[in-house]
């Protein structure tokens, strides 16, 4: 259409249309290669994340859930919850190495480098955690838990693994099952309000646990010594809070909700919201890049990048394109990389894949 317009204007000068067409095509051939690639390069250089590798996952459907990393063994683990497997990738290249079967619906993964073992949470209308050999990839043992096993968080100080379970539609309470990761034993439970919870964070001392009480639209604070809920902070005008990161040095807690997609900053001393910003839809994982003071929240189609200016001020700096339901991610600061899993639930033609992004200065 633009070429026809130019030809028409050119024709008004007295030149024949055929001559004008040759001139237009020549100009396009000369200038498009010069300007278009340089614009793309500049955009990539300015972006906070640069896609450096993609590993397609043909034959997979449904959702991925959470990652785990084995730095020494150069492995990346990914829970393929609807495929009923844990996938193993080369951490540096993204190459697929192995598929661990034997699960019903795997969710969270804890890698134990001292013993080269994994603990995998597994459940929906059932519940268990599985201990997996990191060499043979065989399931060595399981612990039965209430139905609805889902997310989990590890306390490196006590070596306890807190696993969400129980609840369900209409339930008044649910549980955090405490698994002694060193001895692989169920050693206790913490009762939480509402029918379920999502992401959690533990302070450096291993004394407090923060949890998204998604069933009641609150953030909960648990005293890990007494195993009691000691505070409940309402999430204003939003619900389905999924992601969480703790910035302990600034006394700040970051969470992200899905309805609407919003990033919140809480003051951990007061339980009050400091500020909020829009973020990626259908978010599930979020990470704090401490050296660069950046937050990465992964959701469907994009990763939101937010810059922390100081404890109270935050700036939305980018929406980095990813893929459909690309909500699952892990930050590996040792490699300056963000790994993202593109899912496919509800979309028959979805192209599931592992994406590797290099963090830019």
Cite the ranges covered by each PLM segment.
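Predominantly soluble domains enriched in secretory-pathway, periplasmic, or organellar proteins
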Residues: 39-361
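Generic short N-terminal amphipathic or hydrophobic helices
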Residues: 5-6, 27, 329
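Sensor of tandemly repeated, compositionally biased sequence architecture
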Residues: 4, 34-42
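N-terminal secretory signal peptides that target proteins for export/translocation
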Residues: 1-18
């Amino acid at each position: 259409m633009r070429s026809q317009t130019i030809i028409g204007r050119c024709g008004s000068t007295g030149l024949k249309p055929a001559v004008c067409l040759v001139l237009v095509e020549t100009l396009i051939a000369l200038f498009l290669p010069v300007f278009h690639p340089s614009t793309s390069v500049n955009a990539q250089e300015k972006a906070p994340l640069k896609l450096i590798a993609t590993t397609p996952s043909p034959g997979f459907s449904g959702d991925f859930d959470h990652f785990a990393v084995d730095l020494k063994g150069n492995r990346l683990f990914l829970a393929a919850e609807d495929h009923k497997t844990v996938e193993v990738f080369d951490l540096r290249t993204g190459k697929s190495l192995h598929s661990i079967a034997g699960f019903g619906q795997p969710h969270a993964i804890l890698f134990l480098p001292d013993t080269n073992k994994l603990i995998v949470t597994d459940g929906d209308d059932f519940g268990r955690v599985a201990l997996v050999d990191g060499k043979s990839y065989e399931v060595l043992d399981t612990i039965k838990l209430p139905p609805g096993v889902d997310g989990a968080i590890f306390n490196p100080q006590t070596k306890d693994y807190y696993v969400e379970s129980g609840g369900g539609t209409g339930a008044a309470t649910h549980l955090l099952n405490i698994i002694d990761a060193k001895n692989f034993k169920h050693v206790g439970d913490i009762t939480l309000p509402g029918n379920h919870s999502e992401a959690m964070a533990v302070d450096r001392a291993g004394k407090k646990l923060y949890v998204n009480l998604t069933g009641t639209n609150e953030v909960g604070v648990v005293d890990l010594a007494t195993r009691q809920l000691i505070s409940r902070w309402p999430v204003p005008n939003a619900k389905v809070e999924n992601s969480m990161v703790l910035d302990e040095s600034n006394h700040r807690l970051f969470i992200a909700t899905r309805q609407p997609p919003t990033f919140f900053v809480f003051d951990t001393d007061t339980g009050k919201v400091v500020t909020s910003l829009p973020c990626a839809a259908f978010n599930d994982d979020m990470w704090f890049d401490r050296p660069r003071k950046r937050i990465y929240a992964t959701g469907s189609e994009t990763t939101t990048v937010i810059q922390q200016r100081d404890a109270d001020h935050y700036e939305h700096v980018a929406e980095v394109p990813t893929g459909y339901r690309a909500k699952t991610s892990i930050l590996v600061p040792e490699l300056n990389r963000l790994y993202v899993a593109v899912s496919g639930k509800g979309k028959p033609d979805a192209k599931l894949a592992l994406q590797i992004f290099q963090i830019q200065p």
